[in-house]
Structure formats: structure tokens, C-alpha cells
Amino acid sequence: MKIPALPSSLVTPFHGFAILCGTGLLAALLWPDPLVRRVLFLHVLVFLQGILSLQIGEAECGYGPLPLGARLWRLLFFSFLALALALPFLLVYRAETAASWPSFLASLAFLFAHGFGWALVGYALAAVIRWEGLRFLAKYGGFLVASLVPLVFGWPITGLIVLPALWEGRGPGLLGLALYLSLSGVGGIWWWKKPRRFSGK
């Protein structure tokens, strides 16, 4: 398939994502507390990726009518592009934290599933909720709730827990990875089966 051009509405979010990832990495490397240093960049990364993915989904919904195959390809490609932008920072962080390569690859798989899943959420919200103010609240409010509430209770269903656990090779990370791979796969299949409702604005 043809490589999609980045929509103008996503140029600034992608630039901001790369800059903030670099800033988060620098802050993590310079942080004096070693316990915070081990997870700070991963927390920053997974949070920024979720926000960017929601913006990807919303922008894609407003791109115009496209065949579902092309639409799915664009969502997958932009999710991969976001991961590719983060990859150099992740490689530096792996060297600094001495994470194993299996843990590193599992973390990449999780980040892709996490990003694609939230891109589908952003797309669906943009297709269903037409009022911009309500959509903004649902999009970012829902993301904050889904990210922070499980963190308070220690549930391995938020990227803020899953990604550090995968990075360190702990069991809850594998559970979260399986959950996000399943949810993103089921979400993609469900979205594929609803062409009229989710055909774009």
C-alpha cells in the first residue's frame, strides 16, 4: 500500500511528542532518585503516546471518506510512526537501565498495541460525538480515568503499570501486554464491522 502522508493537523502533535519524549528522557536520566529514574521516562512516554494516539484517531476520522482497508492501514501506519519516533529514546533508556532485549521487545509490542488501541478510541469518539466540547471531555477525561484509577489500585491494566513491569520483566507486564493486544485486536475487528457509523465525517 501507499505510504500515507501525515495530515497537517498531526504535524504539530507529532513534533510535540518527539520533543516531550526527549525532554522526559533527559529528566529521567538526570533525576537524583534511582527508583524514580527507572520509571519516569516510561511513565512520560506511555502517557504522551496515549494523548497522541487519541489525536491520531480524531484526525483520521476527519480526513474524509476512505475504504475501510485504507483507513485501517492509515491508523496502523501512524501508530507505528509514533512508536518509531520514540524508538531512539527507548534505545538510549535501555542502555541506561540495562533492560534485557526480550523485555525491550515486549515493551515495543505493548506500546504499539497501546497506541493503536487509543487511536481506535479517538476515531470512534470523533465519529460518535459530534459536539467538540463533549468529545474533548470524553477523550481526555476518559484517558485520564483509564490511566490513573487502575494506577491507584495497582491493577495491571494501565500503561503506567504495564510498561514498567514489562521493562523489568515482571509478571503483571505480560498480563497487561496480552490484555492490550486482545483489546486492540477486538477493537479493530469491531470497528471493521461498523463501516457506516465509523466511515468518517
Where do the model's predicted regions map?
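Hydrophobic alpha-helical transmembrane segments of membrane proteins
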Residues: M1-K201
